[in-house]
Amino acid sequence: MKVIIIGGGWAGCAAALTAKKAGAEVHIYEKTDLLLGLGNVGGIMRNNGRYTAAEELIALGGGDLIKLTDKCARHKDIDFPGHKHATLYDVNKIEGVVRDYLKEKGINLHMEKRVMDVDFENNKINGLLLSDYTYVKGDVFIETTGTTGPMGNCLRYGNGCSMCILRCPAFGPRISISARCGVSDIQGERNDDVLGAFSGSCKLAKESLSDDIRNKLDKDGVVVLRVPAEDINYGKLNTKVCQQYALKEFAENVVLLDTGHAKLMTTYYPLEKLRKIPGLEHAKYVDPYAGSKGNSIRYLSVAPRTNDMKVVGVNNLFCAGEKSGLFVGHTEAICTGSLAGHNAVRLMMGMHLLIFPSSIAIGDLIAYENEKAETREGRKDRYTFAGASYFKRMQELGLYTIHKDEIAERVKKLNLDNIFEQKLV
């Protein structure tokens, strides 16, 4: 029984682990030379409601990747504007650690293998065609290609290619597997009838910052610097994908987080203006390299799905991560990926597919996003455990807690404890 995962980001890696635990032969096809995709320039875990979701995953038996990010943490339990008890993992260490772990678990990694087309008939995928014209057969497929780029979208809906971590000019464009199967993808919107949204942060080389700022980042994990009044731009907040960070504090201040590099919590920032801020006189971008002029564009290719993560209209295709909804974040990708991988094996076995109830945060987020994405207003929102409208909902429903025993008990009451550890084949 062969599960093929297209895209090796956080969602794809999570899907691979749960499918493997359930007993499948698992293959990941990744177009670049790195796993984790945007996770290589991310780093924020366990902030606000993501803490709850992370502990739910651990209780469900799908906490492997959460534990690896904990292990690679540079800082734990830090606060920054609008966010509490965050963990910041080291983006320069995490990919190698995850890659070693997947190999150790017997997952087959196919790097620099870009999927170019699908062999699709009678509502079923028979195989994939790679860009080197290799044909790959499989039983069930999971699309975790994300929604970022390719270059044409970043040009049409953004400020052009910003030379981000996905490196489309070098490794080729992302394609939508669901669209190649004739499925109409959903597109996220922002104000002014514009599609897509800018990625919400950049990375600065920590070595290019002043000694004071660098030392404070190493010690505390966070530095907040005042933006000169003439350079404050509230309008940029509306273009951000990360609405949990679209707070006025992030327009009035430069917020830096220590994730190995210095994570700059804004979509982009002209370097000449950035260097006017004391301590940043010699600042240099390391992601995206053109962080002065723009950032990658996301949410232009979301597959319609049911709450078991199966793509509507294709009998043997699942989706996860941004491909599966207007979700933001590594934790959200790992949650959806874990469910997709597990259900892929259930489908092969002829079993009922698992749908998480709304009495746990993961189940509620998956169902709530699906419902909201049907409306135009809902497509202008983004869904994350960490903030914006969904974190408020978590608090109102009593789903948000940082008490591990309470979370584990909640999962156990539903008879879902260690469900992802069950071997099905």
Annotated model-derived regions:
Residues 2-27:
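N-terminal Rossmann-like FAD-binding beta1-loop-alpha1 element of flavoenzymes
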Residues 345-382:
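Active-site-proximal substrate-binding core of FAD-dependent oxidoreductases
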Residues 377-425:
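C-terminal auxiliary extensions adjacent to catalytic cores
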Residues 18, 24-25, 30-114, 150, ...:
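Conserved N-terminal/central alpha/beta ligand/cofactor-binding core
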Residues 9-10, 34, 323-324:
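Residue-level detector of alpha-helix initiation sites
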Residues 325-345:
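A conserved FAD-binding loop/helix module that cradles the flavin
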Residues 109-249, 261-273:
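Predominantly flavin-linked oxidoreductase catalytic cores and closely associated redox partners
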Residues 242-244, 293-327, 370-382:
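FAD-binding beta-loop-beta segment adjacent to the flavin cofactor pocket
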